[in-house]
From Swiss-Prot:
Superkingdom as given in the UniProt entry: Bacteria
Cellular component, GO, one term: plasma membrane
Gene coding for it: atpC
Gene3D superfamilies registered for this protein in UniProt: F0F1 ATP synthase delta/epsilon subunit, N-terminal
Topology in the lipid bilayer: Peripheral membrane protein
Organism of provenance: Rhizobium meliloti (strain 1021)
Disulfide bond positions: none
Subcellular location field: Cell inner membrane
Record protein name field: ATP synthase epsilon chain
Function field: Produces ATP from ADP in the presence of a proton gradient across the membrane.
Keywords, comma-separated and alphabetical: ATP synthesis, Cell inner membrane, Cell membrane, CF(1), Hydrogen ion transport, Ion transport, Membrane, Transport
NCBIfam families tied to this protein: ATP_synt_epsi, PRK00571.2-4
Gene Ontology molecular-function annotations: ATP binding; proton-transporting ATP synthase activity, rotational mechanism
InterPro entries, per the entry: ATP_synth_F1_dsu/esu (IPR001469), ATP_synth_F1_dsu/esu_N (IPR020546), ATPsynth_dsu/esu_N (IPR036771)
Subunit structure: F-type ATPases have 2 components, CF(1) - the catalytic core - and CF(0) - the membrane proton channel. CF(1) has five subunits: alpha(3), beta(3), gamma(1), delta(1), epsilon(1). CF(0) has three main subunits: a, b and c.
């Protein structure tokens, strides 16, 4: 059995998860990252995507996150999300509204901001394809 560690998923609205887990897969900006017990200390940024949490009991839960930071230590991992929700609670209209708001910001945006917004829109679109049934 895999060793467990402490994991917390926190958004400004609430604490979504605080428990012992055996594995967490996070959507880091450098690519998906699997965190397990005794992981090397790391701090990374999170892009919009799905966080998969495997509990010590063996159950896997999935959460949609919309950016943030992860602080990883050998004894645990804390993910501070800009916004997060369990995938079962994700409202497709909320996701579509975020995409539309980002598209509206594109008008008049400078080159650097435009590039970041286009990337954000692509990440939100991919998130929608992953968690919202067709």
């Amino acid at each position: 059995m895999a060793e467990s560690f402490n994991f917390e998923l926190v958004s400004p609205e609430r604490l979504l998860v605080s428990e012992k887990v055996t594995e967490v897969v996070i959507p880091a900006t450098e690519g998906e990252m699997t965190v397990m017990a005794n992981h090397a200390p790391t701090m990374t940024t999170i892009k919009p995507g799905v966080v998969a949490v495997k509990t010590a009991a063996g159950k896997t839960e999935r959460y949609a996150v919309f950016g943030g930071f992860a602080d990883i230590l050998p004894s645990g991992c804390t993910l501070l999300a800009e916004s997060a929700v369990h995938v079962d609670e994700l409202d497709p209209t909320v996701l579509e509204n975020r995409i539309e708001a980002a598209r509206a910001e594109l008008e008049g945006a400078g080159d650097e901001k435009k590039t970041r917004l286009e990337q954000f829109i692509a990440e939100l679109t991919k998130l929608g394809e992953i968690v919202i049934p067709a």
